[in-house]
Amino acid sequence: MAKGKVLEDTPLIKQFFSVKAQHPEAVLLYRVGDFYESYSDDAVLVSKVLGIVQTKKSNGDKGYIEMAGFPHHAIDVYLPKLVRAGYKVAVCDQLEDPKFAKKLVKRGVTELVTPGVAFNDQLLDQKENNFLAGLAFDKDQCGAAFLDVSTGSFQVAQGSLDYIGTLIASLNPKEIVVQRGYEKGVKEKYGDNLYISTVEEWAFVYDAAVERLKKQFNVESLKGFAVDSFPLGICSAGALMVYLEQTQHTGLKNICSISRIDEDKFVWMDKFTMRNLEIFNSSVGGEGVSLVSVIDKCSSPMGARLLRSWLAMPIMDIKELNSRYDVVQHFLEAGEDLDKVQEYIGNIGDLERIISRAATGRIAPREVMQLGRGLSQTEPIAALCKDHGVKALDSLISKMKNCSKLLDRIMKTMTAEPAAAVGKGEVIAPGVDSDLDELRNISSGGKDYLLKLQQSEAERTGISSLKISYNNVFGYYIEVRNSFKDLVPPEWIRKQTLVNAERYITQELKEYEEKILSAEDRIYALETRIYGELVAEIQRNIPAIQTNCRIIARLDVLAGFAQLARDNHYNRPEMTKDLTLDIKAGRHPVIETLMPAGEEYVPNDIFLDNKKQQIIILTGPNMAGKSALLRQTALIVLLAQIGSFVPADSARIGYFDKIFTRVGATDNISRGESTFMVEMLETSMILHNLSERSLVLLDEIGRGTSTYDGMSIARAIVEYIHEYGRGAKTLFATHYHELNDLEEIYSRVRNFHIAVKEVGSQVIFLRKLKEGGTAHSFGIHVARMAGMPKEVIQSAENTLKALEMNDSQHIVSARKGEIKKPVQTKAGTLESDGSLQLSFFQLDDPTLESLRDKLAGADLNNITPLQAFDLLRSMKDELGL
């Protein structure tokens, strides 16, 4: 090597790094012949994530470079794995036919695939939207845009940071686009697990955003979409259009409209509520059952996605809800027609995503045929649904678009069973194009000719084993085994010698080969043109097809509600404008489906209003069903406010605008928050957002700290909701039996308990809600059921007896069975080996009596939460704690 010579990459590797420099944040898949390859650091990553071999490729003067790759036809298998692993992937294709390239083949990125910008079925959940979100901020306001490129759904919203947080929790975007530099703040506010991408500040400029959207929708103004009052939402939507351009997704014809999400039209449910109610995911991971898995009776992916959208954003519009109830009622009474409608809808498939692939020009021939089959089902569905005297149903059917011309063209143009792709077999039907038919005859006839030539040459030469074959190196050839090579005619031209045979060509063979191959090339060109014209026609019909998709999805959900009601004996709720919740014989929609054979769920009544019974203090044993009762109440309300019938004999519901739950908690270690801190944060958020139409479900508030602290906080919360909560209807489950006395103090507080029956040493859970409080938790019985060692059970029973005796001088030693004198502190509290806490309201110690007097003197009707905490702090100081 010459001294001082600069080592250079080969032209191919130079080109790779040149493209990589344009997309440094992405893994580059680089098309080389029949393979996609990655080099250098990308090769190491690709090998690790995909589990494929990492090897080396020659790189000129530099020796070798790391390489990993896979066959091009396997990209639909490997690309989704990279994206699911959290990587953006740049697909770099050959932009010219290598046969005609004079030097290095021209290449360029044809697509940048990210979690939020995907069309590949392997990356998409059939039953969920795949939202890409954009966020724009201005002081304490935030604008949001949610776009699903796989369906064309495009929505904008604007409001407080917390409100946008509820939308993020509800819609679960797979990727969020923000201004560069905002990544950390967004993750701190909305969650560390979010996938964040960035664009520059200019992408969020309002005027430019408006122009981008007008261009996308091909309109002169956005006024027709009624999004003018959401300027930050428009900025976010414009930024998403910039991001699509940067990821090589331009001119998507399925994105043809935009709508607004109005805060005052939907029920507020924060991420804690959605988690606690297990709407989409069970709290026990893959082992549990979510609400959606029980109620989803949809026959199509489009309906399943709409159902999830309704669950994420229940509505308050009574007229709209009654329209949904009317359709469900009709289907419920329709008998066999319901089954037929569901069968037709099931045959439609996922038209939304099929036409989205058509919008990109990447729709496969078999998907075009599925589109045709889907369109053919709309007419019989309409015939079954119209003219039944159901106004809501007739209105829906009247909005369906006539796509019969497109359907006719698809069915006439395509073969019944098309090949997977143009060039892989027949796609266009016979009779569509006379030139195509003629070329096909030449191609198929040419193959027949070759068979005849093989037979005639075998007879002429006497070489019985002669055969004509084809390969990519020198086309058609005649193969002769060595034992017959002496019989080869002199005009044959030898092309290849093998171990046991020789291969020859003839002038006649080459001439006919050229004719056949020319015909096949022309067939490919003609099929490509005709197919492209059909796809263009589909693209022109996208808005009409999208309208029909939305109607079919709605029918699918409502028909599913009817099946749910039929199978599980649900009844129509009555939605009102008053402030009353009256459920008769309500059941938990999930738990009742999991009951053992022969065992029925015990139904319960719930009544809440703003005048006499605003707050229910619910006590009862462990495992009695308090938490289930809380959840079932919220789930019945939720089902009613998405348009479903409910698991109850009857339900009269004054519509709710917010549903809050505080049920269970876990540590948030990543943020340094304990279980109790998480509990307090969630409860604080609830107390700050109460309204007269709020439904509040609180379960075991205060159990994450000491008994006195927890009980004091629980009591203060109940008092606050009663006095300052604007009449928010509340179910408060607790083991603090001392809270039962609140019924005597506050006019709208009522005590209830879950009944049990004691038979000897056994406890039978009756699961029935009864009036009045209870002072028994039966925790030891539950411990016995859990299989605790008998020594532990005996010790616990001894300790419980001692506590119930409330002997301030002696505590029974559970371990030794002997009487032990406790240690008395300066503040008069008792300490023992078990660190036991005695009842706070039966005292004979002067210090504790003083504290009791302080509590008795507190003006609970006027005290603020802050003053209550100050009082609690001073009491702790007096105790020397």
Regions found by a protein language model. Give the residues of each.
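Charged catalytic and DNA/RNA-contacting regions of genome-maintenance
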Residues: 2-330, 339, 343-346, 350-359, ...
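Charged, surface-exposed helical/loop "interaction arms" that form contiguous linear patches used
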Residues: 360, 364, 374-377, 430-431, ...
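Extended, charged coiled-coil "arm/hinge" scaffolds of SMC/Rad50-like chromosome-maintenance ATPases
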Residues: 498, 502-536
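Amphipathic alpha-helical transducer elements in NTP-driven molecular machines
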Residues: 9-13, 29, 36, 40-43, ...
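Terminal-proximal interaction/regulatory segments of ATP-powered molecular machines
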Residues: 471, 839-848, 856-881
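ATPase nucleotide-binding head domains, primarily ABC-like/P-loop NTPase cores
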Residues: 40-41, 230, 299, 304, ...
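Extended, charged helical/alpha-beta scaffold domains that provide interaction surfaces
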Residues: 451, 458-482, 489
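Active-site phosphate-binding and catalytic loops of NTP-dependent enzymes
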Residues: 92, 115-124, 251, 389-392, ...
